[in-house]
A protein has these predicted regions:
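Short coil/turn segments at secondary-structure boundaries
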Residues: 53-62, 121-132, 187, 191, ...
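Secretory-pathway/luminal and periplasmic proteins that interact with or process carbohydrate-rich
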Residues: 110-128, 137-139, 198-200
Length: 269
């Protein structure tokens, strides 16, 4: 059985409230809701469900020696990961994010650096805190890795195979965030109201079967950008797949407005 360890990401200028609750059975769909259901069902059906392993995830495998190379991911893995990210953004009414090559390279350097030091599943993996730079990784690449790993990180133990969607969905659901129940930092990055782009990286441990996945989505210009929505709720206020809300999945409300008093939460169907 696969075991996923998730790390909470650093999130700026967003106020987040998380709480646990049981899914609510939906009432009868209106015509517009039924149309939305069919739209999201068709869109999900078209998402690639392919499994990737150490042999198929790379176009070029990393080289953990001189000369260091972070490797190059299979383009299909990158595009599928972004398809899932943008599917989940669409569910809550957010625009799609771009996937520029420079962000992918930074994310891949981050993932390969985690793999090079066989990083343990702990919060110190963010920014590679207390990890020594291998002598075959340049100071410049190490600096890029430190920044890229401040974003979303997923550790998949004994990863003989995994799909791109499996990684993104784990980060979205936040069922097993090692920072503690109720932490929704990964979800907040995926569903950011300011984000415009994301880089994707992944690498198997140099001497383990741990799969390190990096979603590099923290950029200074995005953080300073005006939000496209003032609030995000999970599950979404409109139709929402019940598969994304398990018994351990924290529900959440995120807003760009500061909340100074104890809020009251009402759940209505």
């Amino acid at each position: 059985m696969k075991k996923h360890n998730l790390l909470v990401a650093i999130v700026a200028v967003v106020e987040c409230i998380a709480f646990t609750a049981q899914p609510v059975q939906a009432a009868k769909y209106s015509k517009s809701e039924a149309k939305q259901v069919k739209y999201f069902q068709r869109k999900y059906k078209n998402l690639d469900k392919a499994q990737y392993n150490r042999n198929s995830i790379y176009q070029q495998a990393p080289n953990f020696a001189n000369p260091f190379s972070p490797g190059v991911l299979n383009p299909a893995y990158i595009s599928t990961t972004m398809d899932y990210v943008n599917y989940y953004r669409d569910l809550v009414g957010l625009p799609s994010e771009a996937n520029p090559d420079d962000a992918n390279r930074s994310a891949q350097i981050g993932a390969a650096s985690l793999a090079a030091v066989n990083a343990s599943a702990s919060l110190q993996a963010h920014g590679l805190i207390n990890y020594l730079r291998p002598n075959y990784i340049s100071e410049n690449d190490w600096g890029i890795a430190e920044n890229a790993t401040l974003g979303n990180i997923n550790f998949l133990d004994d990863a003989h195979s995994a799909s791109a969607g499996e990684i993104v969905t784990d980060l979205m659901r936040e069922d097993n965030n090692i920072a503690g129940a109720g932490n929704i930092g990964h979800r907040a990055i995926i569903l950011s109201t300011r984000a415009t782009r994301m880089g994707i990286g992944a690498a198997y441990g140099m001497s383990t079967d741990m799969l390190y996945s990096v979603e590099y989505g923290l950029f200074a210009d995005d953080i300073l950008r005006a939000p496209v929505k003032s609030r995000i709720v999970y599950p979404a206020a409109k139709v929402f797949p019940y598969e994304l809300v398990g018994k351990d999945t924290p529900w959440s409300y995120s807003t760009t407005k500061r909340i100074s008093s104890k809020p009251k939460i009402y759940i209505m169907d």
